[in-house]
A protein has these predicted regions:
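Periplasm-facing N-terminal accessory domains of Gram-negative outer-membrane beta-barrel systems
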Residues: 1-29, 33
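C-terminal outer-membrane beta-barrel translocator/porin domains of Gram-negative envelope proteins
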Residues: 433-454, 458-471, 530, 568-672
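Transmembrane beta-strand segments that form the barrel wall of outer-membrane beta-barrel proteins
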Residues: 216-221, 366-377, 393, 398-422, ...
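Outer-membrane beta-barrel strand-turn architecture
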Residues: 393-397, 426-430, 482-486, 548-550, ...
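Structured extracytoplasmic
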Residues: 24-25, 31-184, 190-198, 258-376, ...
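Short loop/turn motifs that connect adjacent beta-strands in outer-membrane beta-barrel proteins
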Residues: 55-57, 345-348, 356-366, 379, ...
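Residues that define the transmembrane beta-barrel architecture of outer-membrane proteins
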Residues: 229, 381-385, 414-418, 472-476, ...
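Transmembrane beta-barrel strands of outer-membrane/channel proteins
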Residues: 65-67, 389, 405-409, 434-442, ...
Length: 742
């Protein structure tokens, strides 16, 4: 029930008495048929039959929507990774609001896939320049499969009135009630089986029309929900002159992660519906979310006058407290004092995680890598150490500049390698960046850094395997990248290298002597030149990336690309330029790549990445210029959908006119494993895949993969077989762990 009131000028308080009428549920004599069926089933069957009609009932609409979101920290551990979290040194208390925002937007929709959101006002507690949550997400239970968020369950959840819902749910009739003369049936919804993506709760269905009046549904962890412990959804629909529309939607998440317990509420209130708007041909462009100028500059008086849901006491206090703290935190003296505390030297950071120094008043950040990843061993340099600090200065908008000087020293070959990289990011409408790098450094023959150095150090020390193959080059690299709009991005890069071959050390260290094994030469055998004399190489590379239907968020000072549901296409052209600055190479090669993630609802997710390419000409080139593929000879996996998990690193490197690769994976996301007692409690998922390489009628190599993922949320284990005609089958196990090797 709504009632608009007017407050006279100067009037601070208005007494408005009201009486809530009782909600009376009528439970008439229940007639159970010969099959012993609850009367709720007859109502549900009629609702299922009408579901497609109501799903497609509204073709387009416009509305005003108010969104309020908050996230609350309910509890936290006394310590986290050895650091005390007592309130004295941890900026929190229990039941403290971590995030609070409000927005008011005009929402325009043209079914099935056109929408536009114009944010008229936005407010974030403690961030006067911030932009709040502004994307309306109407959960339609008229859909067969409810896709709440990929992180919650990539399979989605089955609607209680889906076409096949009777196979998933039990229903119980709990009576009827009347609202404005309309008879409404209350139905309790219960999952038939645990560990299925199903809802629990109440749906209220309008008699004779068999449409939803309101819902109160919940999801629990045993419904294969990720990240959260519970999620409650409440909706109310109301009639208008043009039809029934959603009025309110509230989502209540609740969870616990590493001892941090949190809860929240996300309210959406819809008003001023128009179910017959007139849209021009160009009304829906590639900008689906736009924050109007000054949308985050509204006064408190404005918000008090338009807010449909009053602030709670804790919310009002949070606004007052954080707005005051923001003014204090903008004081340079306060920021400097805070930096002095946070920038103190930490041995754990220096050794394991890296160290960051912030100068907030000057918008400067200096980052240092962890020592553990900066010292390595290989058979070319012996022990080597790298030091690469990064200095970043932020300006207004997306403008920033970063400088990364680097120095590397090989203790056995006594070679010092200094280099530097400078980057500048800019662009008001679309993202642009320009960068230059120069100096002397080590390059892998596969310049895409196919083998992490830390991983190679472990392989060399423990297994007497020196897979890392290096050469040295004096170089200069100049690159420019830009967003072009409509899902298009472009990058061009020029690089010049003076390449120098490097031999292994005369007597590299052998830490663990393996019988019948020795270090291999520092050449990417078997597919490259036997001779690698000193030479010069000038290359020009252009990359065009396109995702059709690419959408953007438009802020007052910049546009941000958010992609689309379409596949991503990448076209790459690379030219080895002969005689430029003494360049000795002469070749042209190309590649075309397409990749996508395809949600299959309850069936899981299918991902693929396919590439074809080759050399148009290969008049003269050296090992670094070959077409290389990402292989893997370690037990830790390389990036899925990018490389071959059992393939020796340079085995099929080539200069052929044509090649193609296909990587595909099918993630069951709980399908099948939710029927296996041990797996369903652990929430482990099955995954299967195939990787294929074809090289100009000379090579056909295939890997078949079956694995288990979502182990402790972050791990994956794969069993892989590799097949090549005329060769024994390769078999191996690969483990995916949340560790980034450098």
């Amino acid at each position: 029930v709504e009632k608009k009131i007017k407050i006279a000028q100067g009037q601070d308080t208005l007494l408005l008495p009201f009486v809530l009428s009782k909600q009376v549920y009528l439970l008439n004599d229940v007639v159970v048929n010969s099959k012993g069926e609850d009367p709720a089933y007859a109502i549900i069957r009629k609702a299922i039959k009408k579901r497609p009609d109501y799903l497609n009932e509204i073709k387009k609409f416009s509305a005003e929507v108010y969104i309020k979101g908050q996230l609350v920290l309910n509890d936290y551990p006394t310590s986290f990774f050895g650091k005390s979290l007592a309130p004295s040194n941890f900026d929190t208390v229990k039941n403290r609001i971590l995030f609070l925002s409000e927005t008011v937007s005009d929402y325009y929709v043209d079914v099935p896939n056109k929408e536009r959101i114009e944010v008229k006002s936005s407010k974030v507690s403690g961030r006067s320049n911030g932009f709040g949550l502004s994307n309306p997400q109407i959960i339609s239970f008229y859909q067969n499969n409810i896709d709440l968020a990929n992180g919650l369950n990539p399979r989605g959840f089955v609607s209680p009135i889906a076409d096949g819902a009777l196979g998933f749910y039990n229903y119980k009739f709990e009576g009827t009630f009347y609202e404005n003369g309309i008879e409404i049936s209350r139905i309790r919804v219960l999952p038939k089986r645990k560990y299925e993506p199903l809802f629990t709760g109440i749906i209220n269905i309008i008699e004779n029309e068999w449409r939803l009046h309101s819902v109160q549904l919940s999801l629990f962890k045993e419904q294969q929900m990720q990240l959260l412990d519970t999620l409650q959804i409440e909706q109310i629909y109301v009639p208008t002159k043009q039809g029934w529309v959603i009025k309110n939607q509230v989502i209540y998440p609740k969870g616990k992660f590493f001892g941090f317990a949190f809860s929240g509420s996300f309210v959406q209130v819809y008003d001023q519906f128009n179910l017959a708007p007139q849209y021009g041909k160009k009304f829906f462009g590639n900008t689906f979310l736009k924050y109007l100028d000054s949308s985050n500059k509204k006064s408190s008086a404005y918000w008090d006058s338009i807010r449909p849901v009053p602030l709670g006491i804790a919310e009002a206090k949070d606004y007052a407290k954080k707005d005051s703290l923001e003014k204090i935190r903008q004081n340079p003296k306060y920021l400097d004092s805070l930096d002095r505390i946070r920038n103190k030297f930490k041995l754990s950071g220096f050794l394991l995680t890296g160290q960051t120094i912030n100068k907030q008043s000057k918008k400067v950040r200096i980052q240092f890598d962890a020592l553990i990843g900066s010292i390595n061993y290989n058979t070319v340099e012996g022990y080597n150490a790298s030091f690469s600090p990064r200095w970043t200065k932020r300006y207004t908008g997306r403008n920033s500049v970063s400088v990364e000087p680097s120095v590397r020293y090989g203790f056995s070959n006594t070679r010092l390698q200094p280099s530097a990289t400078v980057r500048y990011n800019f662009g008001k409408k679309y993202f642009n960046n320009i960068g230059i790098g120069f100096g002397r450094k080590m390059f892998q023959f596969n310049n895409d850094i196919a083998i992490p150095e830390t991983q190679n150090t472990v392989q060399t020390i423990l297994y007497e395997r020196n897979f890392l193959k290096l050469y040295e080059a004096q170089y200069i690299n100049i690159g420019y990248g830009a967003g072009l709009g409509s899902g298009l991005n472009f990058r061009v890069n020029f690089q010049y290298q003076n390449r120098l071959a490097l031999p292994n050390l005369n007597k590299p260290l052998i830490f663990v002597d393996h019988i019948n094994r020795s270090y291999s030469a520092n050449t990417p055998s078997p597919a490259s030149n036997d001779h690698f004399e000193q030479h010069q190489a000038a290359t020009l590379t252009g990359v065009l990336t396109w995702q059709p239907g690419g959408k953007y968020i438009e802020l007052p000072e910049q546009k941000i690309g958010v992609g689309s549901k379409a596949p991503t296409f990448t076209l790459t052209y690379k030219k080895g330029i002969s005689n430029l600055l003494g360049s000795d190479i002469d070749y042209t090669k190309w590649s075309l790549n397409v990749s996508d993630d395809l949600p299959l609802g309850l069936g899981g997710t299918f991902q693929y990445r396919a590439t074809m390419g080759g050399f148009v000409n290969a008049n003269k080139l050296f090992a670094p210029d070959f077409q290389h593929y990402f292989g893997n000879q370690a037990y830790v996996t390389i990036e899925h959908l990018k490389g071959f998990q059992l393939l020796p690193y340079y085995q099929f490197s080539n200069q052929s006119r044509f090649y193609s690769t296909v990587f595909a994976e099918y993630h069951l996301n709980g399908l099948l494993t939710n029927k296996i007692p041990g797996f369903r409690k652990l929430n482990w998922f099955l995954v299967g895949g195939v990787s294929y390489l074809h090289v100009n009628n000379m090579v056909d190599y295939t890997e078949a993969i079956i694995g288990i993922e979502n182990i402790f949320k972050v791990m994956r284990v794969d069993l892989i077989n590799g097949y090549q005609k005329g060769e024994p089958t390769r078999t191996g196990v690969r483990i995916t762990v949340p560790i980034v090797f450098k």
